[in-house]
């Protein structure tokens, strides 16, 4: 928190104005000074509100692909999540090559397109550590210095600074995950990030799935004192709606450990569905698109301010490799059905916020009431087989938009409208006078 408050800024401005002449030049200078003071006072850029599509994002694996960024922006995504790899930046002790490693170009490209960034500060560095982890005091100091240098270089852009990726599994923290060493790393790194970038937010621990006992032990070691938001990766073979009970349990756990007066938001930092599901079942492109739209909608309903879909595009073309089929686009950046579903959701409900879930009589049927000013919309779908439901739209003309953007005009003369509901979300927009 800056000691210079907005009230102090107003007092300073008043003194400047009283001592200056009333020339146009002086007024302009005063205006610029006042703006700079207020900018300094604002502090961290907040998490986005729960308005479509302000918190929608995708994971990426590139540093300088302008055409990909154009497609991402065109789909309505407002965030990207990307590794800011320690070993790529610091190849010689104490020398940070952000430009040569491509991060300057990526940051500039995102900023130009109005895309916010979640940078994952990861992984280890052979200059200091022998494995994919940070276990020594020397390594922690070096990692914290690298992180602070990154925050200083890209300060002022409201970046979410994430400390490591999935430290709770052996793949990313070797030889074995260590709550003790991970929490020590966060404690060593977070203060420097906040000092170097007052507009940024520190987020962690980016866990694989939602490991409640692991999180409980981290919270017990003080993790929530050092971070601004909690990131988890709610992967599951089941449909997205099953996350509701997990978020409820996680919130209760957070509330039992959060410092008094501190609000810790949950961020869905990585979550997607490959065409080869976790239980080895196969999904069609349409099912993947359905799950994408439903994931974003469920996260909004659950007050999750940032939702990152994994992945922007396929990481390869092997038909039997799960990792090659998470994308909203193919390996050569050709849009898949998931991309069209994301673009339709973002454009159709742009500016809308979820107000409540409507009761359709079955737990498997979902209908979310959304609002944008005086405009109303209902997003509705089911987790089971197609059937008909009755929606409370009232006498009105409306537009019904499909998962992929096909629209039909409807006229309802009664209080309710009966429509087919399927596993593909549809958007019913009531026309206003």
Regions found by a protein language model. Name each.
Residues 28-39:
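Bacterial N-terminal signal peptides
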Residues 46-78, 83-85:
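Boundary/entry segment of secreted carbohydrate-active catalytic domains
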Residues 69, 75-95, 102-225, 235:
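Substrate-binding cleft and catalytic face of glycoside hydrolase catalytic domains
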Residues 179-293, 302:
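Noncatalytic carbohydrate-binding groove/subsite architecture in carbohydrate-active enzymes
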Residues 279-342:
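Aromatic/acidic polysaccharide-binding cleft in carbohydrate-active enzymes
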Residues 360-396, 403-404:
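Carbohydrate-binding surface patches
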Residues 411-433:
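C-terminal beta-strand-rich structural cap/linker in extracellular carbohydrate-active enzymes
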């Amino acid at each position: 928190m800056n000691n210079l408050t907005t009230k102090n800024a107003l007092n300073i401005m008043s003194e400047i104005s009283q001592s200056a002449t009333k020339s146009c030049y002086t007024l302009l200078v005063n205006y610029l000074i006042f703006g700079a003071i207020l900018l300094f006072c604002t502090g961290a850029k907040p998490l986005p509100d729960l308005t479509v599509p302000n918190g929608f994002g995708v994971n990426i694996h590139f540093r300088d692909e302008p055409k990909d960024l154009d497609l991402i922006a065109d789909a309505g995504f407002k965030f990207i999540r990307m590794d800011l790899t320690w070993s790529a930046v610091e190849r010689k002790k104490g020398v940070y090559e952000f430009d040569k490693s491509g991060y300057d170009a990526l940051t500039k490209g995102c900023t130009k397109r109005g895309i916010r960034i979640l940078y994952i500060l990861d992984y280890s560095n052979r200059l200091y550590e022998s494995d994919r982890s940070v276990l020594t005091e020397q390594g922690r100091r070096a990692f914290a210095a690298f992180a602070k240098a990154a925050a200083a270089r890209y300060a002022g852009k409201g970046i979410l600074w994430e400390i490591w990726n999935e430290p709770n599994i052996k793949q990313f923290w070797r030889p074995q995950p260590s709550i003790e060493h991970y929490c020590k790393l966060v404690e060593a790194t977070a203060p420097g990030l906040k000092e170097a970038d007052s507009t940024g937010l520190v987020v962690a621990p980016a866990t694989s799935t939602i490991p409640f006992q692991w999180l409980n032990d981290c919270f017990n070691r003080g993790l929530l004192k050092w971070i601004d938001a909690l990131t988890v990766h709610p992967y599951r073979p089941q449909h997205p709606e099953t996350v509701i009970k997990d978020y409820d349990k996680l919130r209760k756990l957070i509330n039992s450990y959060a410092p008094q007066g501190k609000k810790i938001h949950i961020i869905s930092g990585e979550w997607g569905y490959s065409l080869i599901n976790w239980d080895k079942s196969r999904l069609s492109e349409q099912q993947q698109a359905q799950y994408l739209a439903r994931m974003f909608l469920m996260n909004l309903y659950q007050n999750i301010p940032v939702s990152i879909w994994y992945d922007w595009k396929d990481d390869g073309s092997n038909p039997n490799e799960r990792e090659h089929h998470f994308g909203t686009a193919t390996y050569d950046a050709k849009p898949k059905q998931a991309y069209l579903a994301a673009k339709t959701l973002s454009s159709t409900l742009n500016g809308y916020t979820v107000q409540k879930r409507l009761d359709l009589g079955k737990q498997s049927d979902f209908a979310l009431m959304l609002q944008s000013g005086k405009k109303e919309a209902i997003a509705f779908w089911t987790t089971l087989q197609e059937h008909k439901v009755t929606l409370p739209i009232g006498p009105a003309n409306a537009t019904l938009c499909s998962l992929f953007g096909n629209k039909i005009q409807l006229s309802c003369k009664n209080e309710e409208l009966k429509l087919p509901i399927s596993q593909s979300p549809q958007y019913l927009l009531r026309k206003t006078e």
